[in-house]
Amino acid sequence: MELKKYQLQVIKDLDRFLELLIEKQNISKAYNALWNEKGINVGIDGMPPYNPELAGVPQVCFKVPTGGGKTFLAANSLKPIFASMPHIHPKAVVWLVPSDAILSQTYKTLTDKNHDYRKKIDVDFGNKVEIYSKQQLLNGQNFNPTSVSDNLSIFVLSYDSFRTSKKDGRKAYQENGSLLPFVRFKQDSGTL
């Protein structure tokens, strides 16, 4: 499966944003510079200003119509994102979807080693990829500091995974002995 022309342009824009981010060492300045290079103002008469919802975490949004290949774009975005980051960090992705219906479909797709999306990710990361559901994470199933250090770890979650109005959603906030090895991992390596 190959990227379409407009998808290739999206990935090129992502690459350029990441270059500008490294150059400017400031997310908002990189965002403004990218749009300025395209001749588009940022502010009242152009693109909205960068919204730093998570301080220090670059937020990238691809606006693509239904059927436009958002999941394939996301799969193709992982390599450029991690290539631009220092190699000392574990490679971890929260693949957040809007609903539980899309969650099961996305999880099935990403765990199917014969699916084009998974094939792309496997090629880009040398087949060192682990896909986790919320339940696997909470149970510590194949999820440990060594796995996180050695592989690209993709956590497929939905917004519902964190909703506290549902009993299942509250489990993400409970203390969990299955995740205890990460405390020492964090203290030893300072990487999380």
Language-model segment annotations:
Residues M1-L192:
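RecA-like P-loop NTPase motor core of helicase/translocase proteins
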